[in-house]
């Protein structure tokens, strides 16, 4: 071959140089597409957890924000009542926009119901569950009333949503009133069960009417709030505790007054 001359290109039989070049380009495109398709599942696999984690963080932040709003709303409701709650007032207290507060509830009514549920949950944690640590019978019944009184003594200054809500929604049928009534019924039913357990264990007279006894005990709490909060009478808590012991003794309970 002469120096400086390029070797002749040899193409497959029946194909021109242009056709071979076209085929090569097709092969290159096919290889690129194949490699991209092979990598895409791996990319999707690694990005999916990232999206889930981001979604989880967003959900957690939203729940924390909603809990903070409910906490602020509960603080307001104990002083101005459930009817005094408004999206605008909460937006001002929390430093959020009205639309931001509204987005977590959708309506003022749903906000009020959320506050009732939060109040009931805290009531259970402070009154009902601690009393369950006591043995069944008189120890548990007395513990339930003692924790109830303890919470009531704090609420003399702040207010009890069960009591104020009953006045606000007495003649307003609807979901908020239902949520309030259901919460009160649930607690009173727990008190009634404790009374019946005392009877079953022989610590109270069998002929004692549990509903009558529950009525009188509940009446003590209502009287305490009226006299201590509205009339500002001193000694109201002591009289309520003494009256509770009288109710138990009248029903046949035997215990040391100092316990």
Range-by-range predicted roles:
Residues 63-71, 78, 83-84, 95, ...:
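An amphipathic alpha-helix adjacent to DNA-recognition modules
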Residues 28-80, 84-93, 110-113:
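Basic, helix-initiating cap at the start of DNA-binding domains
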Residues 140, 154-175:
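Amphipathic alpha-helical segments used for helix-helix packing
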Residues 178-183, 200-216, 235, 239:
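All-alpha amphipathic helical-bundle segments outside canonical DNA-binding/catalytic cores
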Residues 4, 8-56, 143-150, 185-201, ...:
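C-terminal peripheral helix-coil segments that are non-catalytic and often amphipathic
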Residues 72-73, 94, 198, 214:
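Small-residue (primarily alanine) positions within well-ordered alpha-helices
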Residues 99:
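Key DNA-contact positions within bacterial/archaeal DNA-binding proteins
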Residues 114, 127-158, 210-217:
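Hydrophobic alpha-helical connector segments
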């Amino acid at each position: 071959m002469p120096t400086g001359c390029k070797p002749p290109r040899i193409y497959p039989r029946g194909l021109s140089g242009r056709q071979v070049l076209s085929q090569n380009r097709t092969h290159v495109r096919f290889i690129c597409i194949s490699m991209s398709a092979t990598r895409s599942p791996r990319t999707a696999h690694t990005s999916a957890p990232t999206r889930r984690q981001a979604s989880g963080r967003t959900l957690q932040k939203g729940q924390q924000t909603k809990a903070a709003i409910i906490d602020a709303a509960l603080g307001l409701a104990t002083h101005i009542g459930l009817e005094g709650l408004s999206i605008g007032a909460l937006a001002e207290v929390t430093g959020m926009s009205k639309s931001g507060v509204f987005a977590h509830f959708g309506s003022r009514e749903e906000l009020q119901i959320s506050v009732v549920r939060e109040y009931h949950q805290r009531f259970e944690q402070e009154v009902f569950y601690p009393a369950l640590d006591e043995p069944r019978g008189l120890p548990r019944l007395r513990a339930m009333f003692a924790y109830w009184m303890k919470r009531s003594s704090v609420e003399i200054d702040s207010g009890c949503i069960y009591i104020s809500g009953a006045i606000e929604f007495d003649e307003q049928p609807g979901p908020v009133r239902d949520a309030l009534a259901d919460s009160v019924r649930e607690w009173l039913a727990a008190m009634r069960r404790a009374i019946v357990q005392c009877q079953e264990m022989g610590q109270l007279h069998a002929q004692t009417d549990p509903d009558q006894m529950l009525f009188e005990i509940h009446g003590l709490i209502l009287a305490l709030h009226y006299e201590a909060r509205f009339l500002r009478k001193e000694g109201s808590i002591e009289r309520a505790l003494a009256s509770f012991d009288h109710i138990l003794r009248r029903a046949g309970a035997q215990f040391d007054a100092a316990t």
